[in-house]
Amino acid sequence: MFLECNPRFVSRLTRDTLALIMAGGRGGRLSNLTDWRTKPAVPFGGKFRLIDFPLSNCINSGIRRIEVLTQYKAHSLIQHIQRGWGFLRGEFGEFVELVPAQQRMDKPLWYAGTADAVYQNIDIIKAHNPSYVLVLAGDHVYKMDYGGMIARHAESGAAMTVGCVEVPRKRASAFGVMSVNEERQVLAFNEKPKDPTPMPGNPDRALVSMGIYVFDRDYLFQLLREDAENFDSSRDFGKDVIPNAIANHKVQAYPFSDPVSGQQAYWRDVGTVDAFFQANMELIGEDPELNLYDEEWPIWTYQAQLPPAKFIQGRDGRHGTAINSMVSGGDIIHGAEVRDSLLFSQVVVQPGATVHEAVILPDVRVGEGCRIRKAVIDEGCRIPAGTVIGEDPAEDRRRFFVTPKDVVLVTAEMLGQEVAHVR
């Protein structure tokens, strides 16, 4: 594994790589959280958005040529990237470029699928003349050095490499499921199968795609042109392009592991409200698996200019407190109790309110005497005084969205409030 272990060669490979981040999807399984924003723009971890994780991984890996492909409700995503990701130096050939879906002369339609999104932008890829193209999902949470994967790809002689992780077999139907041989060559790939193939010797686990692909540039163009000429194709990497590649060329798997322990590294698909809630709740633990305080692998984002969080004693003498929780800039806890919760920026919790096991997105006002438990409160909500959320299942289902694991999702629309700003 000479290339993978040699920093000089890895840096040459990453400099010769163009990253394409797929950021055009709605993510319908997140329910009302994506009514007004594309999934990669969904806030996460107190101050970030999902798109910040693949973008940060690129920067930290030495990949400084990045295209972000957008389509569905992209304004807040575009705004976020323009404000927070303009620090690369164009004179050095570095960039984060936004590529919105465009109606072209020969194809007056939007992107028909993930593969079609890349196919429609072959001219842009050609203009940058990379040797390798790294295709990334824009909505997963993880920290990964892509240099090792690109080096393994170059060393293996494969035309395509797929990043993969193990997941419980009962959850594998939400992903592309892979079968590999002892040399990690991919033998089969089934997108979201009803009956996922188990791993050999481990019937309760399945090997699934992370939505991360490395291609030799010219081979990618060949695959996409073949797919475009196939009228039966759904224009999707997982459903069409990867199975075609496996049938005709060498496709390699790249298991995502921690470089120190060798164990599978942290990776979360927060594609449902339950998964989103759980991944955020994990962060408030004493030693979470995802370390957001890691100075060696920072997660970059747009930094709004906000004052520090403030804790105020209420008129009745009760102190504003936050226990086993994360709070953010601009938050005010006024004679209220926050416990086991994660608060994004500019959240105000007014006297007598209690917030337990909740994820509160930015710019939320929690009125006096409210009780909120096991809930996700969407951005911009104004919770009226005395409102109770998370205690009466029947009432919660009548007014809000309740997940299979009884997490209550509350949006401004559900409260009868107007969406006041782009999110």
Swiss-Prot record:
The keyword Transmembrane helix does not apply. It is an enzyme of class 2 (transferase). Gene3D superfamilies: Hexapeptide repeat proteins, Spore Coat Polysaccharide Biosynthesis Protein SpsA, Chain A. InterPro entries: ADP-Glc_PPase, ADP_Glu_pyroP_CS, GlgC_bac, GlmU/GlgC-like_hexapep, NTP_transferase_dom, Nucleotide-diphossugar_trans, Trimer_LpxA-like_sf. Alpha-D-glucose 1-phosphate binds at residues 111, 176, 191-192, 209. Belongs to the bacterial/plant glucose-1-phosphate adenylyltransferase family. This is Glucose-1-phosphate adenylyltransferase 1. It comes from Alkalilimnicola ehrlichii (strain ATCC BAA-1101 / DSM 17681 / MLHE-1).
